[in-house]
Curated annotation (Swiss-Prot):
Annotated GO CC locations: plasma membrane; proton-transporting ATP synthase complex
A molecular-function term among this protein's GO annotations: ATP binding
Ion transport among keywords: yes
The UniProt record lists the keyword Membrane: yes
Subunit (UniProt): F-type ATPases have 2 components, CF(1) - the catalytic core - and CF(0) - the membrane proton channel. CF(1) has five subunits: alpha(3), beta(3), gamma(1), delta(1), epsilon(1). CF(0) has three main subunits: a, b and c.
Protein name: ATP synthase gamma chain
Length: 292
């Protein structure tokens, strides 16, 4: 049975941990507000670019732009995985890593077995996980979320599009956490290349007049679209990470509160037992003296 000193030490340790988790929850909440604003602000711009591509694709021969044309056969796949740099965010990284593994080993099982699935990791957790295993990592970006910058998203998009244009890969998939709410992260795997513009059916393209020509505009718009989509996904992941950390720290704080309650009960019981034992010894000693 634990002594009073042991229980006091545990209570002190749990209180210290509770203070840390409570502070981390407050920090995550502040970061979440900023990250959520950035993610929400990026969505309309990304959506409008996609809408414009849908309109343009009805006015030009999409086969003239390789990034708008799906390959007849997919012989090699590039997976871009976005995770966090830090832990203490629940199952945030574990769940998205599982999705990435499924994309590589299940959705593209034959290509994976033949070593034709490449990987780019943005974030330390995904990079650290896959570099210790049998996966082909082309590039890692550990620490990218410590100072999140558009230039990294642009670099990833340019590398992916360059590989696609050179025929080094036939498909690019991005795996990331999309921010929905604090309690409902959305695990996503989106095809970045080839681009499938929304609204490219019979009704697309009637609302815009393009100058100088749709063909010249689409060549400029496609790279902007790719850069923006990768940036949006990184912003979404950052917001989802802060939400997951806030929820995890809130849960840890509540668990610490419950553990303190149980430890206090144990402490009081142990203290009561010690007092009872001392009283019994005193009474027994007094009775022994009276009997002599």
């Amino acid at each position: 049975m634990a002594t009073l000193k042991d229980i006091r030490t545990r209570i002190k340790g749990v209180k210290s941990t509770q203070q840390v988790t409570k502070a981390m929850k407050m920090v995550a909440a502040a970061k979440l507000r900023r990250a959520q604003e950035s993610a929400v602000q990026a969505r309309p711009y990304a959506a409008k670019l996609k809408e414009m591509l849908g309109s343009l694709s009805t006015k030009v021969d999409t086969s003239l732009n390789p990034m708008l044309s799906a390959r007849d056969e997919v012989g090699r796949v590039l997976v871009v995985l976005i995770t966090s740099d830090r832990g203490l965010c629940g199952a945030f990284n574990t769940n998205i890593i599982k999705v990435a593994q499924k994309v590589m080993t299940v959705d593209h099982a034959d290509l994976h077995k033949s070593g034709k699935v490449d990987l780019i990791c943005a974030g330390s957790k995904g990079y650290d996980f896959f570099r210790k295993r049998d996966y082909r990592i082309l590039k890692g970006y550990p620490g990218v979320f410590q100072n999140l910058d558009f230039s990294v998203a642009k670099e990833i998009a340019e590398q992916a599009s360059g590989m696609y244009l050179r025929g080094e890969v036939d498909k690019v998939v991005v795996v990331y956490n999309e921010f929905k709410s604090v309690l409902a992260p959305n695990l996503k795997s989106e095809v970045l290349l080839p681009i499938t513009p929304e609204g490219s059916g019979d009704e697309g393209g009637s609302d815009y007049i393009y100058e100088p020509s749709p063909a010249s505009i689409i060549d400029v718009l496609v790279p902007k679209h790719l850069n923006t989509q990768v940036w949006r996904m990184m912003l979404e992941s950052n917001a989802a990470e802060q939400a997951a950390r806030m929820a995890a720290m809130d849960s840890a704080t509540e668990n610490a509160k419950e553990l303190l309650r149980l430890l206090n009960i144990s402490y009081n019981r142990a203290r009561q037992a010690a007092i009872t034992t001392e009283l019994s010894e005193i009474v027994a000693g007094a009775e022994a003296l009276q009997g002599t």
